[in-house]
């Protein structure tokens, strides 16, 4: 029975390590990047940015796949939030895999699972951006999908958030089609309003800015689901896509016109996006740093990651934090299984040797009696 006990201990240790400890061990290698300029160093904003968790719905994927991958996303996020204690968390779209396919009741269950998985302590905002799997691509967008996303997750087509004097503009990429549709017109109007708000922050003494709430001006940071226009990941200074594919405007990335419009109206200093499921750091069409954030889910990325950004009104530093790779967990369980087989094989060998010795002794006794 000792070998069964040994196998039980081996499997239990592998289980506890992989399911409860490994995330902390891997994530401890990450640290908040440090701002070198001294003006705002005492109180920078620390933002954790992730993308594309793709929580499975009732139609796609096996229930066991959904259970296990979502368990690991929960463990990874809770480990990260405890270790890093961010000031704000942004999720850059495709929160759900079937958000544009489910009924209102199923969507409510989706939101409940999402908020449970990405639960944060009081006082830390979770800002969720709409993705094409949440409300549909432009051709599929419907007031019903849009209104329920806005209602449950408190985010409309375009929003301006100001946290610690840092301005974030959150955009619904699917409303950047520029074809004059209801959603596009509404989004463009909201962008123009935000542009005026930012202008009044910069020039508060202008006559048209008399009634505007006054915040110190700094160039905004752009957050959306689609990256701004680029031909492919060949334009990235660094990336982790396993292969390069050409991007289509309005499907993989924003169009040139939409990208230029955002640059003209907002004049951002930094941009973050998701959608491609792979990491990319590029200097985009607007001449600013853009980070495409890899998927947070093992279902889309076997080596997922997220971003840690330290930001002040006049500076920023961004670093990539690698999460627990799926292959590491599989290899750990495989190693535990092989170790168990070795223990069992060793025990069987001992049993066989013991029986042979016992048989030899019995044979000698029989010969002695004869």
UniProtKB/Swiss-Prot annotation:
Compartments annotated for it: namely: Membrane
Q: Any idea which positions bind a divalent metal cation 2?
A: 52, 94, 277
Q: State the needed cofactors, names only.
A: Mn(2+)
Q: Which GO terms describe its biological process?
A: endoplasmic reticulum to Golgi vesicle-mediated transport; GPI anchor biosynthetic process
Quick one: where is this thing mainly located? membrane
Q: Which residues bind a divalent metal cation 1?
A: 94, 132, 225, 275
The reply to whether Metal-binding figures as a keyword in the UniProt entry is yes
- UniProt membrane topology term: Multi-pass membrane protein
Membrane spanning residue stretches: 7-27, 328-348
What does the cofactor field's note say? Binds 2 manganese ions per subunit.
The UniProt function text for this chain reads: Metallophosphoesterase.
Similarity remark: Belongs to the metallophosphoesterase superfamily. MPPE1 family.
User: What is the official name of this protein in its record?
Assistant: Metallophosphoesterase 1 homolog
Source organism (scientific name): Drosophila melanogaster (Fruit fly)
């Amino acid at each position: 029975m000792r070998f069964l006990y040994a196998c039980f201990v081996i499997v239990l240790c592998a289980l506890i390590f992989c399911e409860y400890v490994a995330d902390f061990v891997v994530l401890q290698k990450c640290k908040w990047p440090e701002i070198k300029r001294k003006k705002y160093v005492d109180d920078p904003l620390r933002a954790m940015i992730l993308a594309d968790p793709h929580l499975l719905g009732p139609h796609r994927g096996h229930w066991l796949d959904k259970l296990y991958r979502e368990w690991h996303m929960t463990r990874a996020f809770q480990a990260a939030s405890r270790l890093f204690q961010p000031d704000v968390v942004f999720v850059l779209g495709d929160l759900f895999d079937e958000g544009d396919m489910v009924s209102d009741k199923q969507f409510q269950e989706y939101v409940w699972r999402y908020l449970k998985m990405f639960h944060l302590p009081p006082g830390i905002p979770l800002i969720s951006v709409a993705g094409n799997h949440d409300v549909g691509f432009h051709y599929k967008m419907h007031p019903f999908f849009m209104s329920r996303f806005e209602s449950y997750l408190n985010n409309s087509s375009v929003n301006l958030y100001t946290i610690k004097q840092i301005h974030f503009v959150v955009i619904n990429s699917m409303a950047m089609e520029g074809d004059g549709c209801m959603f596009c017109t509404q989004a463009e109007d909201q962008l123009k309003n935000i542009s005026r708000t930012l202008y009044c922050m910069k020039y508060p003494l202008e006559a048209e800015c008399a009634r505007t709430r006054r915040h110190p001006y700094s160039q905004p940071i752009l957050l959306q689901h689609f990256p701004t226009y680029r031909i492919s990941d060949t334009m990235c200074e660094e990336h982790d896509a396993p292969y390069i594919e050409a991007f289509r405007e309005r499907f993989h990335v924003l169009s040139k016109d939409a990208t230029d419009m955002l640059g003209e109206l907002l004049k951002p200093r930094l941009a973050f996006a998701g959608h491609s499921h792979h990491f990319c750091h590029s200097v985009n069409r607007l001449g600013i740093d853009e980070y495409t954030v890899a998927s947070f889910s093992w279902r889309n990325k076997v080596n997922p990651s997220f971003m840690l950004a330290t930001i002040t009104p006049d500076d920023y530093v961004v670093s990539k934090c690698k999460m627990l790779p799926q292959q590491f967990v599989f290899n750990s369980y495989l190693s535990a299984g092989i170790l168990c087989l070795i223990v069992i094989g060793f025990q069987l060998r001992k049993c066989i040797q013991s029986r042979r010795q016992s048989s030899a002794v019995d044979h000698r006794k029989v010969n002695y009696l004869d």
